[in-house]
Amino acid sequence: MAEEARGGQRVVVDDDREDASSVASSTERAFEGEPLPSLGETVTARSAAVSGVLGAVVSVVAMRLNLTSGLLPSLGVPAGLLGFFLARVWIRALDVVGVSHLPFTRQENTLIQIAVVSCSTIAFSGGFGTYILGMSGKSANEGHIGSHGRNVEEPNIGRVIAFLFLVNFSGLFIIVPLRKMMIIRHRLTFPSGTATAHLINSFHTPHGAKQARLQVVTLFKSLGATVLWPIFQWFFAGGKNCGFQIFPTFGMAAYRRGFYFDFSTTNVGIGMICPPMITASMLAGSIVSWGILWPYIETKAGRWFPENLDANDLGGIMGYRVFVGVSMILADGLFTILSALVRTACAMRKRRRGASTVTAAVPPFQCLSATERTMQSFDDRRRAQVFLRDSFPTWVAVASYAALAALSVVAVPLLYPQLGHRHVAAAYVAAPVFAFCNAYGVGVTDMNLSATYGKIAMMVFSSWVGMDGGGVVAGLAACGIIVSAVSGSSDFMQDFKTGYLTLTSPRAMLVGQVAGTALGCVVNPAIFWVFYKVYNMGGGGGDGADVAPYARAYRGIAVLSVGRHGLPDHSVLLCKLFFAMALALSAAREVAERRRWRALRYIPSTIGVAVAFFVPPRIPVGMAVGCLALHVWRRHVDAGGARLLLPAVASGLICGDGLGSLASSMLTLLRARPPICIKFVSRFENQKLDAFLATRHA
């Protein structure tokens, strides 16, 4: 047993040889004979061309989906897959004409995937279907409050591009100093990033590795079957509440509360990758919130909050869901930060006292059994060596964020005068805290809550500025600052996980992220501008397919925040209560882990419980199905095979669902309509339906 210092990071390694099982299940053994490409061999003209073409094409699809449905399938896996095939086509073309070329490596494939995803996700985080369109007069014309004057700002392509360049790079520099802590020390899962990495590794596995070929075959079997499943489901979703995805697994009463299995293979795959404690915690949180708390609060309609409000109105039941869940996430995140600061201070104090060895502190992350593990496998040592080799100075990241914040404090009020300099400064002070909490949650549960943090910022800044000062536009613009920073941070950390598992240089990842973000800040506004001019976006009177549904919702939240305090009755009290409970739960897990209590396995994860307050219960149910399938596979089928093939199977489930959803979305974009409707009704409703049909036939 020995310690190696790499890039200032202490990594514990085992000098003994790995046992036969660990060697057999090693991914990096298959690539051991391949030299690692340099930065110049990763960032090539080929990767730049493929990234540019794919980024633009995928952005068109993402923008169209954003402006019509507000939904977006996972783009990471399709980007990696399409990048692989386009690069192969490029190579074949060069071979035909006899031009020499560099080998296409998994590191270059990862770079393409990072650039394409960072470009296309700006279609959503850029707010084209939400806060930017919500500022327009088309969205305001339907309302009677704040529909003119300083509370309306028509979209302008030049202003939008400038705003995106100011706010979209800040999230990258927030998260860079935390990459070692989250990826190396605490081993956060980042399920989507892990799935993408296994997919890319499978594409580039050397032919001599028998085990790798088995993983590739398994992955493509899982992928192929899963791709067809969403397309098959589409044929039976020919109406509202139709299709297999609304199967009332536990009965109609549970279905109405959201407790059912929706046959989403993405959730099943995530459940197979995530630790069982996370899945159990999310199930517990769903039962407490969706099974007990929200039904009770709904009985208070008319007293605690107005009746007949829209389901997404933060002045109603949605307000309790958002604020109570956010209070728990903030409590756990702040506890984690404070614990890390205390442990760091203690370690520094011991060093100053001349201690020869500083015992590694137990990290404060509760969700993942995050105690620093001994890096015993060849894969762990190899990946850590590459990941820590090209390190970024922390002061450079901090200075870059400070410079971007200072530039935004000056420039954003010129673009949106409703936001003052102090408002922008306050947003940039709060953004790192939100970004850390969100990246932590994404690493554990794969749930990105950046839009939720943006809504919180929208309400705060709208109330701060007020109606007369243009609080509606101010809140929407502040939402953009927070969403861009928070979403960019979590997306980049997902990419760090992908790069860690594919031995991609962190510097190459930063280049790909910056290049893709810069491209997205230009391409997406141009695409949006075409849609905005050609179609009737943001207002009524269109052809029905061109109305952005979330633009009015976001503007309604801002108007609600300006016109009244915005918070439903007793929500602040509930937030305080659950904030205290979350702190107590985090402290209990910390004490139990420090003292190695057996009760630790029964104390739920705070972040898992909190996320369940937002997401529908069908997601934890799907994850539980995946966790149960993995348990049966390990205990009753083949433990060795489960250890070897689990990443491939889970990746195929997640990736295939993303590709299949993209294909079914394309059918929707082509205005194709499913021919069949499968609907589940109760026995009494079926009797009424039969009676009605009998009268029609008579």
Curated annotation (Swiss-Prot):
Expression sites (tissue/organ):
Expressed at low levels in roots.
Which PANTHER family does the record match to this protein?
A: METAL-NICOTIANAMINE TRANSPORTER YSL17-RELATED (PTHR31645:SF48), OLIGOPEPTIDE TRANSPORTER YGL114W-RELATED (PTHR31645)
Gene Ontology cellular component terms for the protein in this record: membrane
Membrane topology of the entry? Multi-pass membrane protein
What name has this protein been given in UniProt? Probable metal-nicotianamine transporter YSL17
What Gene Ontology molecular-function terms does this entry list?
oligopeptide transmembrane transporter activity
Give the lineage: Eukaryota, Viridiplantae, Streptophyta, Embryophyta, Tracheophyta
Q: Keywords on this record?
A: Membrane, Transmembrane, Transmembrane helix, Transport
Provide the species name.
Oryza sativa subsp. japonica (Rice)
Using the UniProt annotation, give all residue ranges assigned to the region (Disordered). 1-36
Q: List the InterPro entries.
A: OPT, YSL-like
Q: Which gene encodes it?
A: YSL17
Any one Pfam family match given in the protein's UniProt record, by short name? OPT
What's this chain's function?
Answer: May be involved in the transport of nicotianamine-chelated metals.
Where does this one sit in the cell?
Membrane
Where do the TM regions start and end? 43-63, 67-87, 114-134, 157-177, 216-236, 277-297, 322-342, 395-415, 424-444, 463-483, 511-531, 567-587, 607-627, 644-664
Tell me its family: Belongs to the YSL (TC 2.A.67.2) family.
